[in-house]
Amino acid sequence: DIGAMSVSESLRGDVTALKQGAKNLNDGISMIQMADGALSEQSSILIRLREITTQSATGTIGNVERVSLQLEFSALRSEFDRIAHSTEFNGRKLLDGSLAASASDTTVLQLGLDSSDNNRFDLNQKINLTATTSSALGFSTDSIATDTGALTAMGNLATAIEKLSVIRGRVGAVLK
């Protein structure tokens, strides 16, 4: 029966498309988990940066200790930026602003049978993962080699921690 065969082929096509949609969803979840893991590492670095900045701001240490703390600060900031610039999923950068709502090239997951909004998930709009570089978060030029520089850095790092927490919250909300 030609009619039954047509219906059968149509349903088979739908099943195949829905299976691919499930795979697309799983890939999207993996991508978000990758970003979340990198953001967690960056968060740990920010906490350590704040700790050594607080140490450098005290009047009980000398210049030699501050120079040593500045070296660690610079190394950690470089690692922070390396994570932001190198974290990717299937060649797609994750923490450089590519997943921000304002990005021109968006990442949309096709989940269903047609192109309606109900069958597509726009990661950029849902996550709005803005760049997480030291420059974007406002501490790229900080120096803790002096106590006054450390005091300035403390304020900038507090703001950076707050901004990163907001970003992580959006990522976590999408994962739930």
Set out the residue ranges of the language-model regions:
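Primary detection of the long, small/polar-rich alpha-helical "axial" segments characteristic
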Residues: 1-176
